[in-house]
A protein has these predicted regions:
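Residue-level markers of secondary-structure register and packing in elongated scaffolds
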Residues: 29-32
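Short, well-ordered alpha-helical segments
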Residues: 19-20
């Protein structure tokens, strides 16, 4: 439904919309604009209850994003996302995925809260500290996450990072790691 993003939709937009849906489902942040063009933030208790209800329904597998946008007169803020990478699970894996990664500038008046299912714990941390924490074994961190974090180390602000990545979106290519046996160990 083109009314969801307020512009001509193309196949590419479906990934941006899916990213916004996942963000809302997994951490409760909804990237959207109000009818007046302002960035959405739940402005009262009633809107907060509506959001919680839709998030619960989304977490139960109901496709409710369009319904939510219509009820609150919202347009998804696809322009606040930048496409960072596209990872494809190696052929040797039984379950394969084709996953696109994005970055976004979170609205200042929305609080991210993990869903307790896909995300069971959350913290704000710099990319450098996330990489170090993973290396030390403080928390699990997988190869795509490590590489995505390495790609954003060195930016001085989220705005700078977002602007840079928006300019480079056409340069994103697919990554499919290759693994092989060497000296009895799987390496890639």
């Amino acid at each position: 439904d083109r009314s969801l993003v307020g512009s001509e939709m193309c196949i590419r937009d479906s990934y941006w919309i899916a990213c916004i849906r996942e963000c809302f489902e997994e951490c409760g942040v909804l990237l959207a604009y109000r009818e007046n063009g302002n960035l959405f933030g739940a402005s009262d208790t009633e809107e907060t209850k509506i959001l919680a209800s839709y998030r619960d329904r989304l977490n139960n597998g109901e496709p409710v994003l369009l319904e939510l946008c219509k009820e609150l007169n919202l347009k998804l803020a696809v322009d606040r996302l930048a496409y960072v990478s596209h990872w494809i699970t190696p052929k040797m894996e039984m379950k394969r995925y084709s996953t696109r990664f994005f970055i976004a500038l979170a609205p200042s008046d929305q609080k991210a809260i993990h869903d307790g299912s896909e995300g069971v714990e959350s913290t704000w941390i710099t990319p450098e500290n996330a990489i170090k924490g993973g290396e030390k074994g403080n928390f699990p961190i997988i190869l795509p996450t490590i590489r995505n974090l390495e790609a954003i180390v060195g930016f001085t602000s989220t705005n700078e990072l977002l602007e840079n990545k928006i300019k480079c979106q056409s340069e994103v290519s697919s990554i499919e790691p290759k693994f092989f046996m060497k000296d009895g160990k799987m390496i890639g």
